[in-house]
């Protein structure tokens, strides 16, 4: 069964209801009814006349609902009455269907104080409705409801009660029980609160412990990290200290080694200086000149071998001084004396040190006296404390000596003379060969016999003035060879080529040229006296011998390197009767201690220093000699194994000219001034070596065997 519906006209229903309940509104009633054939409630009418006007609008054929506001005089507020109108002509089915709608309609219209059921106008009484509103029976004002109430009152029973007498024990138990549970509840709540607090405290304590543990772990890590850093720093400091100590030790070792090296170098320098000083002292103190012996042996060998066998002194090989008794590949067949002698052990055959043999015993005293008188100057003694000798190494001294020797150069040679002069030389050479062959036949005891027979000669003027560099082995210019060869008799012509390389070792070019003019005549006279067997030949005038012509581009000949501090000028070997008393080079006996008395040697020093010629006269003599030269491009045997020309040799001499000139500038003051030095760009080809031991030990054995 369907219920009443308010949805279709809900706004109209509520608007009419609001008009009734609002005090400001004039309307005080509203009538609602169903739509035709449906249960939808709608507004039928509204007005301001109260219950009387409302009762006039009810219809007998419809079910209607009236809502009215009734004002009571005793009440301040109005009352609201809901009238349920069921007309007499309404079907019963409709009445039964709408009976259940009253409660929903009263609920929809809130504030209904009294519900009045009416089917006619007489049921709508204003006095009855007001009475009911005043005593509270307004609900029962309906006759139907009144009858129903009366029927209920008749059937009602007496009302019972639940009251009981209060029992103190029971009441106390009940109260105690309630208090107990309340206390238990409170205790439980307190316990739970304590447990919560304990859990919170435990959690806080755990957090604190965890934080403390983390802090301790962090501190421990930091401590270990600091310890590790300290260890690393200590290790680094130790490593740095070790490195510093190692560096100091290395520096100390290096300094020690450096000091040792410096000490060794200093000791080596002192040793070399002491050797130089010792050698200089020995050279300065010796009264004889060992090189004289070898020069005389060369002359003897060249004289014994003949002029055809003697190699020209200008047919040389560079780097090696000329020596007739040294067999060379480019020289002619050697003589018997030179073939039997052994070559020198050093590349400098003329350089000797402390063991220089004293070979004066191989010659008679007469020859020794003639050598001493013909020597230009004695050996200049140089103090071992001389700074130029003691503090300078051997190589520098040799170089300076070479520079001093080559500081002066001769003028260029004139063109060679006509070949007519060659014929003049052939006869003296043949005579010299015969005389030297006779010298081989002479016995050894005759050497010492001549010493007693030959008286010393008084103050014969020396040929040449020596210079401080006479110990150096050098080769003179062609005019020096002529100076040594021109005063000799016919027998000396055979060795003029050899004398060109050997007789001029101790003198420079300028010194020889200046002393040549004044010494030719006295030297010739003294040589004539020395050769008694050839007096007739010496009395006759003799043409000047032929001198080899140097190359056109050369200005001076090669200088052979001699020892330092030797100053004796080599005289020509006598080839007269004394040649028979001379022994062969292989048959010479052991030489005596000295060549001659040092007193006699010292007597010739002032004469040698005083006899110095002027430059113009020396140059004129040199020009006359050079005009007679015929041989083309001679060569000299030098310290090497190959030949070199005089131009190259001259360049080698000029290479050392500057330093030698500076060192020996003061020593050249007593000598004649030389031409200015000539410098060359080509380095020297002379093999300069340090002082060596005795270069001819095998020849000494040969001398002993000859005895």
UniProtKB/Swiss-Prot annotation:
Modified residues (N-acetylalanine): 2
Compositional bias ranges of the Acidic residues kind: 695-707
Pfam families named among the record's database cross-references: Cofilin_ADF
Ranges of compositional bias, category Basic and acidic residues: 209-236, 288-298, 428-438
Function: Actin cytoskeleton-organizing protein that plays a role in the formation of cell projections. Required for actin polymerization at immunological synapses (IS) and for the recruitment of the chemokine receptor CXCR4 to IS. Plays a role in dendritic spine morphogenesis and organization, including the localization of the dopamine receptor DRD1 to the dendritic spines. Involved in memory-related synaptic plasticity in the hippocampus.
Keywords: Acetylation, Actin-binding, Cell junction, Cell projection, Cytoplasm, Developmental protein, Differentiation, Neurogenesis, Phosphoprotein, Ubl conjugation
Amino acid composition bias (Low complexity), ranges on this chain: 329-343
Modified residues (Phosphothreonine): 377, 381, 392, 549
Annotated Gene Ontology cellular component terms: actin cytoskeleton; actin filament; asymmetric synapse; axonal growth cone; axonal spine; cell-cell junction; cortical actin cytoskeleton; cytoplasm
An MF annotation (GO) of this entry: cytoskeletal protein binding
Parts of the chain that traverse the membrane: none
Protein name: Drebrin
Positions carrying Phosphoserine: 141-142, 241, 342, 383, 385, 391, 467, 659
Positions with biased composition (Polar residues): 355-364, 380-395, 639-652
BP GO terms, sorted: actin filament organization; cell communication by chemical coupling; cell communication by electrical coupling; cellular response to transforming growth factor beta stimulus; cellular response to tumor necrosis factor; cellular response to X-ray; generation of neurons; in utero embryonic development
Region entry Disordered, spans: 209-438, 452-497, 531-557, 582-609, 630-707
CDD domains: ADF_drebrin_like (cd11281)
Extra information: Drebrins are classified into two forms of the embryonic type (E1 and E2) and one form of the adult type (A). The time course of their appearance are different from each other. Their structures are closely related. Adult rat brain expresses only drebrin A while drebrin E1 or E2 is observed in immature animals.
Subcellular localization, as worded in the UniProt entry: Cytoplasm; Cell projection, Dendrite; Cytoplasm, Cell cortex; Cell junction
């Amino acid at each position: 069964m369907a219920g009443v519906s308010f949805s279709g006209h809900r706004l109209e229903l509520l608007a009419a209801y609001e008009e009734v309940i609002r005090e400001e509104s004039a309307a005080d009633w509203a009538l609602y009814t169903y739509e035709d054939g449906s249960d939808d409630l709608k507004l039928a009418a509204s007005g301001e006349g109260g219950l009387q006007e409302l009762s006039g609008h009810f219809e007998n054929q419809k079910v209607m609902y009236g809502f009215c506001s009734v004002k009571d005089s005793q009440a301040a507020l109005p009352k609201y009455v809901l009238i349920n109108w069921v007309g007499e002509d309404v079907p019963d089915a409709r009445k039964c269907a709408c009976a259940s709608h009253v409660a929903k309609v009263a609920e929809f219209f809130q504030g209904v104080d009294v519900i009045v059921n009416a089917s006619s106008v007489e049921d709508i009484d204003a006095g009855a409705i007001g009475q009911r509103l005043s005593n509270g029976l307004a609900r029962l004002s309906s006759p139907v409801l009144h009858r129903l109430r009366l029927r209920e009152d008749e059937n009602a029973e007496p009302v019972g009660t639940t009251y009981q007498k209060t029992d103190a024990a029971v009441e106390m138990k009940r109260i105690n029980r309630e208090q107990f549970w309340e206390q238990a509840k409170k205790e439980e709540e307190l316990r739970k609160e304590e447990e919560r607090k304990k859990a919170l405290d435990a959690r806080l304590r755990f957090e604190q412990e965890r934080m403390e543990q983390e802090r301790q772990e962090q501190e421990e890590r930091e401590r270990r990290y600091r310890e590790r850093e300290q260890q690393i720093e200590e290790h680094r400091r130790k490593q740095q200290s070790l490195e510093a100590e190692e560096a100091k030790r290395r520096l100390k070792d290096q300094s020690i080694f450096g000091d040792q090296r410096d000490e060794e170098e200093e000791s080596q320098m002192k040793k070399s200086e002491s050797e130089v000083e010792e050698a200089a002292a020995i050279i300065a103190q010796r009264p004889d000149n060992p090189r004289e012996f070898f020069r005389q042996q060369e002359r003897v060998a060249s004289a014994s071998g003949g002029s055809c066998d003697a190699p020209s002194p200008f047919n040389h090989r560079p780097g090696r001084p000329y020596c007739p008794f040294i067999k060379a590949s480019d020289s002619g067949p050697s003589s018997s004396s030179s073939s039997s002698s052994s070559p020198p052990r050093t590349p400098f055959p003329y350089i000797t040190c402390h063991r220089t043999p004293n070979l004066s015993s191989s010659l008679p005293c007469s020859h020794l006296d003639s050598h001493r008188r013909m020597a230009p100057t004695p050996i200049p003694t140089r103090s071992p404390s001389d700074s130029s000798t003691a503090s300078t190494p051997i190589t520098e001294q040799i170089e300076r000596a070479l520079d001093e020797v080559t500081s002066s150069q001769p003028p260029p040679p004139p063109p060679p003379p006509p070949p007519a002069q060659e014929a003049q030389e052939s006869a003296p050479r043949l005579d010299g060969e015969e005389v030297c062959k006779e010298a081989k036949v002479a016995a050894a005891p005759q050497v010492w016999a001549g010493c007693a027979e030959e008286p010393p000669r008084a103050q014969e003027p020396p040929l040449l003035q020596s210079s401080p560099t006479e110990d150096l082995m050098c080769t003179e210019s062609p005019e020096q060879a002529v100076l040594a060869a021109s005063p000799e008799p016919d027998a000396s012509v055979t060795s003029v080529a050899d004398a060109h390389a050997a007789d001029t070792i101790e003198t420079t070019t300028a010194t020889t040229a200046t002393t040549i003019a004044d010494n030719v005549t006295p030297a010739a006279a003294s040589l004539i006296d020395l050769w008694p067997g050839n007096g007739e030949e010496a009395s006759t005038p003799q043409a000047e011998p032929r001198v080899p012509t140097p190359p056109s581009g050369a200005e001076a000949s090669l200088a052979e390197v001699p020892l330092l501090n030797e100053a004796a000028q080599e005289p020509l070997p006598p080839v007269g009767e004394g040649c028979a008393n001379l022994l062969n080079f292989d048959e010479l006996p052991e030489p005596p201690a000295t060549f001659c008395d040092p007193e006699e040697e010292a007597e010739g020093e002032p004469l040698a220093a005083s006899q110095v010629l002027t430059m113009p006269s020396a140059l004129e003599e040199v020009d006359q000699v050079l005009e007679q030269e015929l041989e083309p491009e001679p060569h000299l045997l030098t310290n090497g194994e190959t030949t070199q020309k005089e131009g190259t040799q001259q360049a080698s001499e000029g290479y050392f000219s500057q330093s030698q000139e500076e060192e020996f500038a003061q020593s050249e003051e007593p000598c004649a001034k030389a031409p200015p030095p000539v410098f060359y760009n080509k380095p020297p080809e002379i093999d300069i070596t340090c002082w060596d031991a005795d270069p001819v030990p095998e020849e000494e054995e040969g001398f002993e065997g000859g005895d």
